[in-house]
A protein has these predicted regions:
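Extended ligand-binding regions for polar small-molecule ligands
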Residues: 86-95, 154-155, 161, 167, ...
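Acidic, polar ligand-binding/catalytic clefts
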Residues: 90, 94, 99-163, 240
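Ligand-binding clefts/hinges and TM-proximal coupling segments of bilobed small-molecule sensing domains
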Residues: 49-54, 179-197, 232-238, 265-284
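Extracytoplasmic small-molecule ligand-binding "clamshell" domains
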Residues: 35, 48-125
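Bacterial lipoprotein signal-peptidase II cleavage site
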Residues: 16-32
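Bilobed "Venus flytrap"/periplasmic-binding protein-like clamshell domains
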Residues: 71, 81-92, 146-203, 221-222
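Periplasmic-binding protein-like
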Residues: 68, 144-153, 221, 225-266, ...
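A ligand-binding cleft/hinge motif common to bilobed small-molecule-binding domains
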Residues: 108-109, 126-134, 185-186, 208-211, ...
């Protein structure tokens, strides 16, 4: 009888231990399920400049290099840089969960700032050119521009063709390292049809025109309209010097950020945000 009782007690203990072991298995599975559910968050693209999908020059920020003397694309209202590029950049930053910070600098420093990683994007009504593509990558185009010619109202230059006429010898004012500079250097200066005076700001070139130091100014059409509206005695020729595409300059060494910015830009173009921003500043 004692043997039977001992055997029954042993069996009870075995079942009890098995039951306890069974309780532990679901607990472990629950813990594993929780970890798996959190994994996508840690691996998802994090727009914070951290170690996730992409990095930025400053964690949590999108640094935009610009030259804020280019209305209506970028210019100052008080101490704040506003304009088409500023608003598009802000919309991109918002999509990426970043804070936009604008760094105003000389135009010819923008490409180097982007190339060297001091800025994440370069926006300054920047035209895509083969020369610039050697240093930086460009996103999809978000706007088109036209190079226009500003002259005094009594100028003997009546069309762009006059700049290329046989025996022409005009002094052309441009903003240094802009496409106006590039185009006129190749088409006028290198061809022996005149000289190019280069200025750090478009406004300085326009002032040189007003005071007679240059015969005309070649500059993007939208700032040209703004300058002519501000300065009496100037006009824009009816014929354009050249047409071009504006895009965002980015480093060749940050593919992940490039893809994120370009994807955000595409979405903003597709949903009409970019066009709405352009229309806000430019009347067709």
């Amino acid at each position: 009888m004692k043997k039977i009782m001992a055997l029954m007690l042993a069996l009870v203990l075995v079942f009890a231990l098995c039951a306890c072991g069974g309780d532990k298995t679901p607990a472990n599975n629950a813990s594993t399920a929780t970890d798996v559910s959190k994994a996508p968050e840690s691996e998802a693209p994090a727009a914070n400049g951290g170690d996730a999908a992409f990095t930025t020059a400053v964690s949590g920020k999108l640094i935009m290099a610009t030259n804020a003397t280019f209305p209506p694309y970028e210019y100052y209202e008080g101490t704040t840089v506003v304009g088409i590029d500023a608003e598009i950049a802000a919309a991109i930053a918002e999509k990426l969960g970043l804070e936009l910070e604008i760094d105003d600098m000389e135009f010819d420093a923008i490409t180097e700032a982007v190339k060297g990683g001091k800025a994440d994007i370069g926006m300054a009504g920047m035209t895509v050119t083969d020369e610039r593509k050697e240093s930086v990558d460009f996103t999809d185009s978000y706007a088109t521009g036209v190079q226009s010619v500003i002259v005094t109202e009594d100028s003997d230059i009546t069309s762009v063709d006059d700049l290329f006429a046989t025996g022409a010898s005009h002094v052309v004012g441009v903003q240094r390292n802009t496409t106006g500079d590039i185009y006129t250097t190749e088409g006028i200066e290198d061809a022996g049809l005149g000289n190019i005076d280069r200025y750090s700001k478009g406004a300085d070139a326009v002032q040189a025109l007003k005071t007679g130091k240059v015969d005309c100014v070649v500059i993007d059409n939208e700032p040209a309209k703004a300058f002519v509206a501000e300065v009496e005695g100037l006009k824009i020729l009816d014929t354009a010097y050249a047409a071009e595409d504006y895009a965002i300059a980015m480093s060749k060494n940050n593919t992940a950020l490039y893809e994120a910015v370009n994807a955000a830009l595409k979405e903003l173009i597709a949903d009409g945000t970019v066009q709405a921003i352009v229309d806000k500043y430019i009347n067709a």
